[in-house]
Amino acid sequence: MKKIEAIVRPAKLEALKDAFLEAGIKGMTISQVQGCGNQHGWKEYYRGSEVIVNMLPKIMLTVVVEDDKVDSTVELICNTARTGEVGDGKIFVFPVDEVVRIRTGERGDEAI
């Protein structure tokens, strides 16, 4: 099993949720995050002082999938979230040693 974390533009959230559901990925965690990278921020003025805003709002989607679904899930995220502009985001893939469904005690793939 792998945990996939995708940090994407907030405007892509609904399209990604729809794509996940269509692909049979039912469980996901969505967090509002801020980040910086190659995408530069902007300047604002507050009470006459210049303020550089370089932490930009993003959405982090987290899903856990079976090993054989990792490539297709990453491809789905890329195809859905890509605009071709700086700031499209990043995808991180981590190994998952164990998953336990608290309600039933199920473990492994059955708990996803």
Annotated model-derived regions:
Residues 1-112:
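Positively charged, small/polar-rich N-terminal and surface patches that mediate targeting and assembly
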